[in-house]
C-alpha cells in the first residue's frame, strides 16, 4: 500500500467526503473540496508520486498560489466512492511557479481532472489566504438541502439571510459572526462564478449559491465542515418553522448583541439591523 494513503490529509479527506455524503449534501458527483497543503507536509510522500506528472493549464492564472500544493476531489467523482478508492477519486497537485498551470503528482488513477470548480476554489483560496493571514486552508462546496430550499423563499440579500440563520439557532452568530454572502445564480464551473464567490469570501466565510449549494472556508476540514453543518442545521430549523406558519417569537437584536459580547465576536453590523 502507498504510504500516502495513511497520511493525515488523505484520511481527513476520506472522512470529510464520507460525512458529507451521509449528510445527503453530495449526491452523485455533487460537491467538491480543496485542501491547501504545505511543502513539508507533502515531502515525506514523494516516493508515491508519478515520475512524469501531467501538466494542465489553468483557465485563469493564479500567481498568488505559485508552487502551492492542493489535495482536491476529482471532476465527476462520487463522494461516496472516495473511501473505497481514494487514489482514483482524489488528486494531489502543485501549481506551477508562474501560476499558469498545475501538475498532477498523485491520484486520478483512471484519468480525469480536478473538480470543475477549481477556478472558484483557487480564487477563494487566494482571498481567504489574504483575509486570514494564511490560516484558512480549506474550501468546501456542497448541496446542503435546507440552505438551497431557503434560497427559493427568502430574499437573496446578505444581511437578511444572515439574520434569519442567526435567529434559527443560538450558536450561529458565534460560529459565523461574519454572516453569509450570496451571489446571483450563475452557470457553475465558470471563472465568472468563481470571481463572484471570491468577492463575497472577502467578507464572509460562507457563500450561498442560490438554487445550487453553499461554499464554506476554514483552517481545517473539520472547521469548514462544522461551519456548513451549523448553517445547514439552522436552515433546517427555519424550513420547519416556516412550514408551521412562521415565527411567533425569536432571538432579539439585543440578545444577539449580548451573545456576541459573551463570546467576544464581532457580528456583521448589517445583519443586526436587518
UniProtKB/Swiss-Prot annotation:
Its main location: cytoplasm. Binds 1 zinc ion per subunit. CDD domains: Aldolase_II (cd00398). It is found in: Cytoplasm. It comes from the Bacteria. Keywords: Cytoplasm, Lyase, Metal-binding, Rhamnose metabolism, Zinc. One of its GO terms (cellular component) is cytosol. GO terms for biological process: pentose catabolic process; rhamnose catabolic process. Belongs to the aldolase class II family. RhaD subfamily. Homotetramer. This is Rhamnulose-1-phosphate aldolase.
Amino acid at each position: 500500500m502507498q504510504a500516502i494513503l495513511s497520511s493525515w490529509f488523505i484520511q481527513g479527506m476520506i472522512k470529510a467526503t464520507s460525512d458529507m455524503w451521509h449528510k445527503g449534501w453530495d449526491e452523485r458527483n455533487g460537491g467538491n473540496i480543496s485542501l491547501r497543503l504545505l511543502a513539508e507536509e507533502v515531502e515525506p510522500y514523494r516516493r508515491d508520486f508519478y515520475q512524469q506528472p501531467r501538466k494542465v493549464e489553468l483557465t485563469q492564472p493564479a500567481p498568488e498560489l505559485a508552487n502551492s500544493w492542493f489535495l482536491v476531489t476529482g471532476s465527476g467523482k462520487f463522494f461516496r466512492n472516495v473511501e473505497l478508492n481514494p487514489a482514483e477519486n482524489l488528486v494531489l497537485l502543485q501549481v506551477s511557479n508562474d501560476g499558469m498551470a498545475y501538475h498532477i503528482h498523485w491520484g486520478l488513477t483512471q484519468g480525469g481532472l480536478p473538480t470543475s470548480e477549481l477556478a472558484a476554489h483557487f480564487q477563494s483560496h487566494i482571498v481567504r489566504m489574504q483575509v486570514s493571514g494564511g490560516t484558512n486552508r480549506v474550501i468546501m462546496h456542497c448541496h446542503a438541502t435546507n440552505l438551497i430550499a431557503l434560497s427559493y423563499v427568502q430574499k437573496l440579500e446578505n444581511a437578511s439571510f444572515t439574520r434569519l440563520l442567526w435567529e434559527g439557532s443560538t450558536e450561529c452568530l458565534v460560529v459565523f459572526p461574519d454572516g453569509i454572502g450570496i451571489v446571483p445564480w450563475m452557470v457553475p464551473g465558470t471563472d465568472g462564478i468563481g470571481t463572484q464567490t471570491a468577492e463575497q469570501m472577502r467578507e464572509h466565510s460562507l457563500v450561498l449559491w442560490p438554487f445550487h449549494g453553499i461554499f464554506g472556508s476554514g483552517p481545517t476540514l473539520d472547521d469548514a465542515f462544522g461551519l456548513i453543518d451549523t448553517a445547514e442545521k439552522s436552515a433546517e430549523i427555519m424550513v420547519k418553522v416556516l412550514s408551521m406558519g412562521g415565527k411567533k417569537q425569536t432571538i432579539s437584536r439585543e440578545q444577539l448583541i449580548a451573545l456576541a459580547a459573551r463570546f467576544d465576536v464581532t457580528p456583521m453590523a448589517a445583519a443586526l439591523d436587518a
